[in-house]
Structures are given as C-alpha cells and as structure tokens.
Amino acid sequence: MADPGGAKQGGDDKAYLWRLHRIFALYVVGVVAFLALMAWAEQRGLSRHWIGPIFLFLTVMVYAGIGVYGRTTDPEEYYVAGRRIPPIYNGMAAAADWMSAASFISLSGALYLQGFSGTPGQAGGLAYLLGWTGGFCLVALLIAPHLRAMGLYTVPDFFHVRFGGRWPRIIAALAAVLCSFTYVVAQIYGVGLIASRLTGVQFEIGIMLGLGGVLLCSFLGGMRAITWTQVAQYVVVLLAFLIPVSWLAYKQLGNPMAPLVYGAQLGKIADMEERLLDSPAEHQAVVAYLRRARDFEARLQDVEGALERERQKARERVRALRDQNADVGLIVSASRELVSLPRDAASARERWTREMRENYERARPLGGLPLHSQAFAGDPNGSPHERKEYELARRNFLALMFCPMVGTAGLPHLLTRYYTAPSVAAARTSVAWSLFFIALLYLSAPALAVLVKFEVMQNLVGSSFETLPNWLAQWARVEASLLSVEDVNGDGLVQFGEIRLGADLIMLATPELGGLPYVVSGLVAAGGLAAALSTADGLL
C-alpha cells in the first residue's frame, strides 16, 4: 500500500483517513481476488511449478512497487514518515515489523516440539508468546509515549538528549546496529529457504532475490515507504497464517474458529501419546537410536581409526556394487556416502559428537518430545527429584517469559516505529493496535501446533514408507535438517519417534501435511516471505 499522494493533512483529518481506508480496502480486495484466481487456475490445471514462482515474484514486485512509489527526499518523510501515520496503520506496520520469519515460520514449530511449557532441560512453549506480547504492554506504558513526546528521529537521539554527551549516543548506536545485524540474519535465512522451496532456485539465489526486494522497499523512501509496504505485507501474513489453521480446524472439528475449538484435540493427542508410550514398535525405534548413539560414542574413542574403517567399508561397498553390475542408482548412492564422510579427524569428531547427541536425544519416548499438554516437567506430588524438577521448570518458564518481555521493549526497529505517530496519544493507541494485530496471529499459533501434531499422529504415524507423500522428499532436499523420516526399526511402518520435523518446517508444510490445495502452500510461503521482508525492511 503506497502513501496516497503524500498530502499534508494531519493524521486525524477525515478526508485523509477516508482516502487511506479506501486504498487499503481496494488492496485487500485485490489480494483476495488474486487468491481466488490462483485457486481457479489450479483447478483448471495450472502446474504447481508455475504457482510457486507466481506467488514469489508477484508479491515481491508489489512490495517493490510500493517502495518505489513512496520514495522521498524530504528528511521528515524519510525518517519518520512525516509524523502523520494513523494509529491503526501504524499498529499494522508495527505488527508486520514484529512478525519476523522467526515468529511466522518457527513459533508454531516451537510449540509443536516443546509443548506448552518446554522440555525438562529447556523452558519454552507459551513462555515466548506471553513474553513477547507482554513486551508491547511495557512499550505502551513506559516507552512509546515518551519517545514520541521528544519529537526525535532515532533511538540514539533519545539517549543523547536523555543522558547527554557523546558516548551514550555512540553506545546506543552500536547496540542498535549489533541487534539489527543479528536479527536480520534470521530474516535473510527465511527468505532464502522460502524462495528456494517456491521456485526451486538455489538457496543463495533466493537470498539475493530477497535482498533486492528489501533494498527497493526501504532505501528509496525510508520510513514512509517502509510503513506502507509493511501494511501491505501484514495483510498477506495474516491471510497466510489464518487460512491454513482455519482450514485444518474445519477439516478436523467442523469449525474454522481454531483458537476456540482446538482444545478438543488436546485430549485426543494425550490418548495417542499414551498409546505411543506403550507401543512395542516405538520401543524398538528407541532401542535403534540408542544403538546408533553408542556406536558414535565408540567411534569417538578412536576417531582416526574409526574414520579409516568407515572409509574402507564405503570403498568396499562401492567396489562390490560395481563387481555385481548393480543398478547405477545404488552405485551413485554408495559413492555419495563415501564422498560425504568427514575429511579429517577434527571434522569427524565434530560431526560424530553432534550425531551422538542427536541420537541420544531421540532415544527417548516420543522421540524426545514432551507430553504436549503437560503444564511443567516433573511432578509436584512425586518423588523429591520430580518435585525439584517441577519447581525448576516453573522458575525457568517465568525467567524465559521475562527475558523476551524486556527484550521486545528494547528492540530498536520497533521503537522507531512510534516516532511516526501524529501525537503522544496516537503513539499509545498505535501500540494498542499493534498488540491487537499481533494477537490475531499469536492466539492461533498454539492451535496450529496442536492441529498439526494431531494430523501427524493420526495420518502419518503407522503409514507405510512405500506410500509416503512426495512433499516429504521435496522438503528434505531443500534442507536436510528440516525433515527426516527413517525406518530405524526396519518394520516398514512410520513410527512417531522416527519422524523429525524442524521447527521451521511446521508452518511451511502445514498445507501439504493437511492435504490442502497447493495454492494454500504458495500463500503460506508468500506469508513467510512477507514476514521476513517486513522485519528486514525495518532493521535495515
């Protein structure tokens, strides 16, 4: 959405607001019409090899077009968008700024892997949701109004005025740059991951495409262009998150209001978890992972000797296959295994240590995942060790909730957003709108984690390896660490402990996991791209 003409009316001017509302409504209608058109085209036979690139390039071009249209050379417009952004759109832009690739892609995945409270050794789950949303309460009460009242341009300016001298400003600038650089790396990774999955291009090329879009969106128009780009991106993010979770909820429960009805699936998941804990096949998988872990542990006792033995085994396998005139595919696979062995003892030690830990972690009930609905690890009424573990888990949960809360309140790319408000009161209202728009997604994240886990346990566990869907192999080719399904107990059936899903995969693979049309997969990927680009815009 572009700044409509750059007219100098105040943020409260009715004609100015009406024009904004009209342009925003037209944009939303256009997005919905585009989705309907793509769904119709898919039904008419449009290949998914075209759907993915269309979603990627069209959305990036729209964002870039808004950035070019919003270009300006006025310093007031460039740094603070003329201080005339209405609170509702400021809140929408702040929500998009906050909804990074980590929130959009990984939040539901973290809840899937950690349950509601996290693992015994690492707190997590809902602590992130509570901490991040609580941070906006601190911003509304303690920070945003005071920043806007000073009428400055940047956070270092605030430190210069508040504390005086040169060093506070330099320290604030260095902290902002360090924080932004660290955070933007995750966004660029998300851009590369999504672009490579949508179009099939290499990961590095996907990163370059995303960076080009970021530059066009932010550098020509500054905060003015970024604001309206982020408003447009929030619409895509919202639709991309709510449509799949609502579709899954309707498919499983007959009601699309996922945050209100997903509790019914928690009881079913608890029953499935109990059956999996008693399953002989699951126990066999645990034993297989334990055997692997001990094998890696034995290799680490003599790394150089073990590496030489592994190389010799791989060479003999390749030689035997060639002597038998085996299938070319088998020979190529064996040759790849030989080439993929560590090059030296140092890299072998590093890899085998990592794999030993991973296998020990998976050699636990439910593949190392906690019971999803468990409040905290341990048992307040159990043994002394269980009571101690319970108290430690509670304290870790509260500590983890506090840290993101304070961290959110200090993020520089969020704080500068409230310099664009017309007044101090508008800054407070902007934070309230931010919290509302963020809550629309965050309330659905726990529901999505539960619905996806039910889908995995109900439809994927127990299926034959010969009939696994193609999307599993496609995602594994994008990034091997995202997904692994391996028949470790040799029974030919998928066990829950044999499935490893990365946190970054849960959201992106939800449409395919739930059997939704591919156009929804394209929308989810476009939403993840919008989330990454919106945060990268604000950071850069």
Which role fits each region the language model picked out?
Residues 10-17, 151-163, 167, 222-234, ...:
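Hydrophobic, small-residue-rich membrane helices and short re-entrant helix-turn-helix hairpins
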Residues 43-54, 115-130, 195-205, 386-401:
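Interfacial loop-to-helix junctions that mark the boundaries of transmembrane helices
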Residues 13-31, 95-96, 100, 122-221, ...:
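Helix-loop-helix module between adjacent transmembrane segments
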Residues 85-88, 162-170, 199-209, 393-394, ...:
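Membrane-interfacial loop-to-helix junctions in multi-pass transporters
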Residues 65-66, 77-152, 301-346, 361, ...:
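Membrane-interface helix-loop-helix modules in multi-pass membrane proteins
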